């Protein structure tokens, strides 16, 4: 009987441990993952809105620069590089989900024209593979091969990301044409300020939800604060919860207004978007242009030779 009770107790402890571990994993995973472009896949069918705004800006509120470099023109069924640069000060440290400071990660979403897609590994040259490094790109949706996402990846190593792109061939793809196409890119450095569910992360400023007097500040054991604000007119108390990370900017006894910042803004990152244009060039048009240029050069040469010949004839007649 004692052995059976011991076994039942041990079984219960193991079950509770697994349940708690699973809950911690889910909460931690959600708080970390929702801050990068790759996770916009979860809530949006298309990352680019009708207004031209990329949805990553919903969570990354600070505006930062991003740059894209692509060839001016490419031939059909050709692999080329799309280089995305996400610049930032490498000395900066961001607030992590646990409130500690750490290095910034980066992420990007690349929106290509229909028909353009990620180049297969066997079409990528060794030189391009060296530039890509260990990056692993994903399509935004299985049906949207022209939209690629990457991240989060270490910013100190991958502030410049090289995408290997395969251009379409209108001869085999009836939806592709020899035209000029737009390319859009969005890139972020650091964590977001708002999660997709609308809740704030700990990487943003926290404001007072009520006006009044700061009557009590409790520093929590695992970081963060509980700030009690008392309305002087009716004595009503409101408690604002501050997670670990932001630095407190108010003190007990201080009079504050509604929406007044209670903390500093710890965010050092941000999101930016840019665009470029690329021409899918018809090889026959290129050949025609080369033929035209060659004919012009030959015509100039023959004109010079004819002029020289005419001058010689004139000189001989004068001497005669």
UniProtKB/Swiss-Prot annotation:
Bilayer disposition of the protein: Single-pass membrane protein
Which InterPro entries has this protein been placed in? Cyt-f_TM (IPR024058), Cyt_f (IPR002325), Cyt_f_lg_dom (IPR024094), Cyt_f_lg_dom_sf (IPR036826), Rudment_hybrid_motif (IPR011054)
PANTHER family in the record: CYTOCHROME F, PTHR33288
Entry binding sites for heme:
36, 56, 59-60
> Which keywords has UniProt assigned to this entry?
Chloroplast, Electron transport, Heme, Iron, Membrane, Metal-binding, Photosynthesis, Plastid, Signal, Thylakoid, Transmembrane, Transmembrane helix, Transport
| One GO CC term on file | chloroplast thylakoid membrane
Q: Which family does it belong to?
A: Belongs to the cytochrome f family.
Signal peptide extent: 1-35
Q: How is the cofactor bound?
A: Binds 1 heme group covalently.
Record note on quaternary structure: The 4 large subunits of the cytochrome b6-f complex are cytochrome b6, subunit IV (17 kDa polypeptide, petD), cytochrome f and the Rieske protein, while the 4 small subunits are PetG, PetL, PetM and PetN. The complex functions as a dimer.
BP GO terms, sorted: photosynthesis
Q: What is this protein called?
A: Cytochrome f
Q: Which PROSITE patterns match?
A: CYTF
Give the source's domain of life in one word. Eukaryota
What are the TM regions of this chain, as residue ranges?
286-306
The subcellular localization recorded is:
Plastid, Chloroplast thylakoid membrane
Task: State the function annotated in the UniProt record.
Answer: Component of the cytochrome b6-f complex, which mediates electron transfer between photosystem II (PSII) and photosystem I (PSI), cyclic electron flow around PSI, and state transitions.
- Could you give a GO molecular-function term held by this entry? heme binding
HAMAP family linked = Cytb6_f_cytF
Gene3D superfamilies given for it?
2.40.50.100, Cytochrome f large domain, Single helix bin
- Which cofactors is this protein said to need? heme
């Amino acid at each position: 009987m004692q052995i059976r009770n011991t076994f039942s107790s041990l079984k219960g402890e193991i079950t509770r441990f697994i349940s708690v571990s699973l809950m911690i994993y889910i909460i931690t995973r959600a708080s970390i993952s929702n801050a990068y472009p790759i996770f916009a896949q979860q809530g949006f069918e298309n990352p680019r809105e009708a207004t031209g705004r990329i949805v990553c800006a919903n969570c990354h509120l600070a505006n930062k620069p991003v740059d894209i470099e692509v060839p001016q023109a490419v031939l059909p069924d050709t692999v080329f590089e799309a280089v995305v640069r996400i610049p930032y000060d490498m000395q900066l440290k961001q607030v992590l989900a646990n409130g500690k400071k750490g290095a910034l990660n980066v992420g990007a979403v690349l929106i290509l024209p229909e028909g353009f897609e990620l180049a297969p590994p066997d079409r990528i040259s060794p030189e391009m593979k060296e530039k890509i490094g260990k990056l692993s790109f994903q399509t935004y949706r299985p049906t949207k091969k022209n939209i690629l996402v990457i991240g989060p990846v270490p910013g100190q190593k991958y502030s410049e990301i090289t995408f290997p792109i395969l251009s379409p061939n209108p001869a085999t793809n009836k939806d592709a044409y020899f035209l000029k196409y737009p390319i859009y890119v969005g890139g972020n450095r650091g964590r977001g300020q708002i999660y997709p569910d609308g809740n704030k992360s700990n990487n943003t400023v926290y404001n007072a939800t009520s006006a009044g007097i700061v009557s009590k500040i409790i520093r929590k054991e695992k970081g963060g604060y509980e700030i009690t604000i008392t309305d002087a007119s009716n004595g009503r108390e409101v408690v604002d919860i501050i997670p670990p990370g932001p630095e407190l900017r108010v003190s007990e006894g201080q009079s504050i207004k509604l929406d007044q910042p209670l903390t500093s803004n710890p965010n050092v990152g941000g999101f930016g978007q840019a665009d470029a244009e690329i021409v899918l060039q018809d090889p026959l048009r290129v050949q025609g242009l080369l033929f035209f240029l060659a004919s012009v050069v030959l015509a100039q040469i023959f004109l010079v030779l004819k002029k020289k010949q005419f001058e010689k004839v004139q000189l001989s007649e004068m001497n005669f």
